[in-house]
Amino acid sequence: MFRTIKLFCFFTALCAVSCTSHSGSGGYVMVEGFAQGTTWHITYKSFKGENLKPQIDSILTAFDNSMSAYNKESQLTKINNNDTTIIVDRFFKEIFDNSLHLYNISGKAFDPTVSPLVSLWGFGKHKDMRRPSQNEIDSVLEFVGLDKVTIQDGRVVKSDLRITLIFNANAQGYSVDEVSRWFDSLGYANYLVEIGGEVFAKGVNSSGKTWRVGIDSPIDGSTEEDRVIQAVVSLSGKSLCTSGNYRNFFVENGVKYTHELDPTTGYPKRDSLLSVAVIAPDAVNADGLATTVMVLGLENGFRLLDSLPDTEGYFIYSTQNGDFATTKTSGFVVEE
């Protein structure tokens, strides 16, 4: 779905390592596909070699029908077009509630109404990147702010009809959780779900070891094809999601502008932080918090993650001489 701000998604590239799978009776099966404007890969220990791709596709299609900004018939598209007859489904209500929670705990740094600013700066669908004028920014800020939106009797109510919602900053994490809960409901104990780089893992891999997940080094302009792994973590019963500013930026008059926009000012955050990896009990919060931290910056982002229970962060930032440096919260364990 979600090419517009994930752009919030494409730079979150994680690489699952040491989880090579094989099919067969009772063996590990790997399935993959395309949804939400990106790829997904899922590995699970089967009962009898069963292929679950059709069921997974069905879950993700239902998810897109709720929240895809590219599906003209989705609930999100109709709501953004000010169709007031729409009664939101469970997907929409839950992602809205999570977004409101993140909006409140972040001091409005996390905001799914920010897409007009993203488009204004040229980080959206058409990729016409430029530094807008202050007047242009001010005019757009008038209809940015999740506190201008409520759900009343199942319907979305906006204080300004120009407000649009897009949940790219946490929706893929939410879809990871939805698929993971489905695996749990069927009794699967060992699996790894990755959608657009957002990961939830449970149990062990085909080698009988805890799943190992790689975190990319934030090299400017790097792609998924030429990524370099910065660190590796073991993961089971938790999610790991990343965000960074090294794949979607432009330079104008010697100044680097990244796509991580502060919804309260309308400008990209100027900070030494290059990327962050967040571990949390669920992917919707890990995903949303990763984006939030990039907007808040290194110091404030570290403080936020450190204050949250069962939540850890790994931060990669630039030193004054341009080298990479790292810091992490106390509970974030990196493999040696």
How would you label these PLM feature ranges?
Residues F2-K6, C19-E336:
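Mature catalytic core of soluble alpha/beta enzymes
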Residues F11-T20:
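Hydrophobic h-region of N-terminal signal peptides that target proteins for export
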